[in-house]
Amino acid sequence: MDKSGIDSLDHVTSDAVELANRSDNSSDSRLFKTQCIPYSPKREKRNPIRKFVRTPESVHASDSSSDSSFEPIPLTMKAIFERFKNRKKRYKKKKKKRYQPTGRPRGRPEGRRNPIYSLIDKKKQFRSRGSGFPFLESENEKNPPWRKILTFEQAVARGFFNYIEKLKYEHHLKESLKQMNVGEDLENEDFDSRRYKFLDDDGSISPIEESTAEDEDATHLEDNECDIKLAGDSFIVSSEFPVRLSVYLEEEDITEEAALSKKRATKAKNTGQRGLKM
């Protein structure tokens, strides 16, 4: 009985110790769950990028593994061409069309003339027609230079427009002379001589015409003996200069003569020096 009682007591004590340990563990876990550890600013941030240095043993191991997994395939011409064709097909698939075909015909429609010609074709066409200037034919110049033809054409156009201007001027001159009743002058004078004259050259030069009424008023004044007297045609300003002005003029003449003499002396010196140098 004594042995059985001792064994039971040992079993009870062991169970109690296990329960105490379990309670301690549970209390610790509850503390971790409920309580938060305060943040300490002194902690340093860990660098997320870790430096990994490969040792020569690891390099050798990786090389051996890659050699075992990948074996080089011998390249042939057929394989190179197939690879090039596949790459070309992929490029064509990726490439997009810039425009969508409408189905209309391209280029200039038939029957229309192209306005762009070269200078050589123009010269050939012009020379095939022949020269239109008779004085060139007399000089036996069948194919004159291109620049010469252009100058002749410009001269012909200039003369034509000058002749039209002359006809227009004659027409206006006839109408204006008929209005002024000067139609007889047209038979005696040419248009070229009349061109540089005014239409009213035959009349008085001054625009204000003197009337006979002013002459009558002058005769009446002479008869009535007025205080006003008419001055005769005499030169008011005298030609004699005063004494001071004559002195100034003499001084100016002297200074001019002195300046001329100095210039002559300097020229003579310069010529003498040049002769000695030569």
Swiss-Prot record:
Top-level lineage group: Eukaryota
Record keyword Phosphoprotein present: yes
Ranges for region Disordered: 19-71, 88-115
PTM annotation (Phosphoserine): residues: S23, S138, S234
Gene Ontology BP term (one): regulation of DNA-templated transcription
Matching InterPro entries: TAF1D
GO molecular function annotation: DNA binding
A GO term from the CC aspect: RNA polymerase transcription factor SL1 complex
Keywords, comma-separated and alphabetical: DNA-binding, Nucleus, Phosphoprotein, Transcription, Transcription regulation
Residue ranges with Basic residues bias: 43-53, 88-99
Entry-linked Pfam families: TAF1D
UniProt keyword DNA-binding present: yes
Subunit annotation: Component of the transcription factor SL1/TIF-IB complex, composed of TBP and at least TAF1A, TAF1B, TAF1C and TAF1D. Interacts with UBTF.
Family annotation (PANTHER family): TATA BOX-BINDING PROTEIN ASSOCIATED FACTOR RNA POLYMERASE I SUBUNIT D, TATA BOX-BINDING PROTEIN-ASSOCIATED FACTOR RNA POLYMERASE I SUBUNIT D
Stated name of the protein: TATA box-binding protein-associated factor RNA polymerase I subunit D
Record organism: Pongo abelii (Sumatran orangutan)
Gene: TAF1D
